[in-house]
A protein has these predicted regions:
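Beta-sheet-dominated scaffold domains
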Residues: 195, 239-240, 248, 275-455
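Short strand-coil-strand connectors
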Residues: 77, 85, 131-133, 207, ...
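Secondary-structure transition/turn motif
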Residues: 84, 92-93, 118-122, 149-158, ...
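A short beta-strand motif characteristic of beta-propeller blades
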Residues: 55-64, 175-183, 219-225, 266-273, ...
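Hydrophobic or amphipathic alpha-helical targeting/insertion segments
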Residues: 190-226
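Small/polar beta-strand repeat architecture
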Residues: 99-114, 119-188, 223
């Protein structure tokens, strides 16, 4: 037996995250050499990430090819809004009631008089169809928590048993309803939720067609202004709607009159500004509209067209892709040419500091920035977590990589950014939304389905 008389316990805290830029000889105790599909936990240590599952059971219908990826997924007015091919669709999603009395047996007969109990029916049509697992049901009415007049095994599907438990939810989702058509050659969408007149709306842009506005009835209205046709970027600032990313005027930012996303009369407060670089993203932060370009960053300040002013933040650093820009932990975070960076406001009003934060995992960025065709990001506020996905269109989902960034308190008392690696999630588009205190982290897949992360 070895003599252990001189040995001592050496307690340490798992903190510091994944480190790929330092020798193991100088790494601190608790830092990780490998940290894949684990996340730094704001409550301490590292934990395995939660997975993802279909949030809408049926596939988003394609236009001309099953190879079409999902171009948009977002949450608006209790509906899931998605785009694929040339069309925009809506659905709704809830959970099967978790009590044992709410289970559905395979032999249970439902021929127009069945009742299915769910968590809630908010967002579902007053009558229509829904899907549980692979079985489709029709219904003729609903209450706040039940579908009534239910017929099962519709649309050539087979009856099956369905149940939910306290730890495992069973998704109940509405079949897709088309809301807009004819969006020829649409690219990936950007969107902005807003309320200028007491009515919630969402404006969608796709880089090719006219911007389109949806109201809470999901009726669509195209914005026909020629100056913003083909916009791919949109943001609301000071009650003006700003549009950018037009292929013919990539350096121009066009804004509407106040409180009207569809009016561009210059004498009533509309106008445009130009910068000397191609715009890739817009983000409102600390009373300014930040304009991210390929090689520069600007900010627009002011309260109206009379005093809007554009000033440079930096002329030396740009943003690789506008889909990486997020408000995170009191800063704006974005993907620069050398990794993740923040636009951090200091104590001096108007002073801005640009800093890189991802040097600990620089090799992962070096391996992925140049050959990734799609970049997507989400923020999980309750975890103070930012996720960035590097997607190669032809690559396998199982080989798709990403980065988790967490701002986490350290033993020193100061917060620090910690990182880990994601593998096996391949989003074509993303969105995060807080719904009645619940955080929805959605992504649309290259396979045509809508998924919810953190499942």
């Amino acid at each position: 037996m070895p003599d252990l008389a001189q040995t001592q316990h050496f307690p340490f805290v798992c903190e510091g995250g994944l480190i790929s830029n330092r020798s193991t000889f100088i790494m601190r105790a608790g830092e990780a050499l490998q940290l894949e599909n684990f996340e730094p936990d704001v409550e301490g240590g590292y934990r395995r990430i939660d997975g993802f599952k279909r949030h809408v059971r049926s596939i988003v219908p394609h236009t001309s090819s099953t190879e079409e990826s999902v171009l948009l997924t977002t949450f608006f007015d209790n509906k899931i809004i998605a785009a694929r091919g040339e069309k925009i669709w809506s659905s709704a999603s809830t959970d099967l009631g978790r009590a044992s009395i709410n289970k559905i047996t395979a032999g249970e007969t439902m021929s127009g008089s069945g009742v299915v109990t769910v968590k809630n029916t908010t967002g579902f049509s007053s009558s229509g169809s829904f899907v549980i697992d692979s079985e489709e049901f029709s219904y003729t009415g609903k209450t706040t928590t039940t579908f009534t007049g239910v017929t099962r095994s519709t649309n050539s599907t087979s009856a099956a048993a369905h149940a939910a438990t306290g730890t495992n939810r069973t998704v109940v989702s509405e079949t897709w309803t088309v809301r807009d058509t004819g969006r020829t050659n649409a690219g990936k969408y950007s969107f902005e939720r807003f309320n200028y007149d007491g009515n919630d709306k969402i404006v969608l842009v796709d880089g090719t067609n006219a911007p389109v506005v949806l109201n809470t009835s999901l009726a669509t209205t195209d914005i026909s202004e020629s100056a913003i046709a083909g916009a791919s970027i949109v943001a609301s600032y000071r009650e003006h709607m700003f549009y950018a990313g037009m292929s013919g005027t990539p350096q121009e930012l066009v804004f509407s009159v106040p409180f009207d996303e569809d009016s561009f009369t210059s004498g009533q407060g509309a106008g445009s500004v130009k910068v000397d670089d191609t715009i890739v993203g817009l983000k409102v932060f600390r009373d300014a509209l930040f304009i991210f370009c390929q090689n520069r960053i600007f900010k627009l300040t002011g309260s109206s067209s009379a005093n809007f002013a554009v000033t440079p933040v930096t002329r030396d650093i740009g943003c690789i892709n506008g889909k990486t820009i997020q408000e995170f932990a009191g800063d704006l975070i974005f993907l620069g040419p050398d990794g993740l960076r923040t636009v951090a406001g200091t104590q001096n009003i108007g002073d801005v500091n640009i800093g890189t934060i991802s040097s600990n995992v620089q090799s992962i960025f070096d391996d992925n920035i140049l050959d990734s065709s799609v970049f997507e990001s989400v923020v999980i506020p309750e975890k103070t977590q930012y996720r960035l996905f590097f997607t190669k269109t032809s690559g396998l989902e199982s080989r798709t990589e990403g980065i988790i960034c967490v701002l986490k308190p350290q033993q020193s008392g100061q917060p620090a950014y910690e990182f880990s690696k994601i593998k096996g999630i391949k989003p074509a588009c993303t969105d995060s939304f807080i719904e009645q205190g619940n955080i929805l982290i959605l992504h649309g897949g290259f396979d045509g389905y809508i998924y919810r992360q953190e499942e």
